[in-house]
Amino acid sequence: MWFASIWIFTLRLPWELGAAFFYEHLLDGDVASNTLSWRWVAGLQTPGKTYVARADNIAFYTDGLHAPEAGRLASVPIAIREEPLPKVALWTEDQAQLTSLKTFERIGLWVHPEDLAVETGELADLNIQAVNAVWPHAIRARSGWSEKVTAWTQAALEDGATRAGKHFGAKVSSGEAADLAASLVEWAKSNRLQAVVAYRPFVGPWLAEALALGATLASVGIALVWRRRTWDTEHFPHATRGYFPFWERINAAG
């Protein structure tokens, strides 16, 4: 928050550039938490409520390692305004698809970095015949990740795919592909799959990749079934304001 506050209010730089800088360099950068954190500091997420870094606070919590001189940091936030963001419909699972999934004998699993614990949860008991963890070559350019972030994410993907392969007793396909959809089709056909299942990515670069997969697989008669973890399905409807109202609603719901 110190960094974001200094960036926005002292240096007077656009918060969007700061968020992009963080997302480019943070190894575990997350589209949602990164964006929301910067918006909150700027006074946009909770309109009118800003976070302004103080020199004494920085000096105290860094044990004097960083002690900005008096008057160097902005003490009054600048007013940032924007047009209201459009409402986005909450995605929900297709119950007909979930029913049809039970009828398939040969199912493949697509693993991506947004959920690398597929050996637990809703997919854990499926009879998976093959696991795919192919890396789309162009995603780094589209996401703006640094080389270190890309390498770290690729290593995490390999680790998650290896665990998935061991859990399901299935062969893992990895490597890079220029066209993820075409690569998945070739993989699915070679493994005689009737369906491919995956946790649906959230808004961000992996969802952008995922949206093209369904139609491409369907064109060769292979179903793509999206899942979402139960806790996300149950909690998302409560995420309409800040953290504390969200927490209170979850507690009230039991």
List the predicted regions and their residue ranges.
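Trp/Phe/Arg-rich N-terminal binding region typifying the photolyase-homology
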Residues: 24-27, 33-34, 85-254
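Active-site-proximal binding-pocket segments
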Residues: 1-96, 101-106
